[in-house]
Amino acid sequence: DFLQWVIHRLLHTNRFLWRFHKVHHSVTEMNFAAHFRFHFVEHFIYKGGLYLLLSWLINFELKYVFYIHALNILIGHLNHSNLNINYGVFKYFFNNPKLHIWHHSKSFPKRFANGANFAISLSVWDYMFKTVYMPSDGKLIELGFENIEKYPQTFVKLMQEPFKSNTEL
C-alpha cells in the first residue's frame, strides 16, 4: 500500500505523469463510476508495473496480484462513492469517502499545491507524511481542476489529450 501511495503522489507531482492522471481528476461529480475514469497509460504504469514489481520482489504467485487488484477495485469504488460514512477513529488508518473526496477538490491551500490525500487503502501514510487535507465533510466542494470546462469530455479526446504537445506540463 505504501508503494501505491508513493506512485499516486508521483502522479500528482511529476508534470509528465500528471498529464495521464489528470483524466481521472476530470470528474466533476463524485460517484463510484469516477473510479473507472482513467487513462490506460496511467493504469498500466500504476497498477501493472506496481503489481509485477511486487510479485518479482516478494516472489509471490501472480494469482495473488489479481486478488489484490480486485480488493483495490472494491476499495476504490467505496472511496469514490458519494456515501457519507464516518469511520470514527479508524479514519486515521483506512482511507474513506469523506477523506478521498478532498483529493478530488478543485482548489487546495498553497501548501497542498500538488494535491493531498494520496492514500489508496491506508490513510495512515497521509497522516504520517502530513499530506492530509479534510477541512469539512466535503459535501459541497467543487471537484476537478482549474479550467476544467476546456478539458475534453469524450472518450477519444480524453485518451488523446496527454499526448498532445500543447498539453500543459
Regions found by a protein language model. Give the residues of each.
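Membrane-embedded catalytic scaffold of the fatty acid hydroxylase/desaturase
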Residues: 1-141
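A membrane-cytosol interface segment of integral membrane proteins
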Residues: 140-169
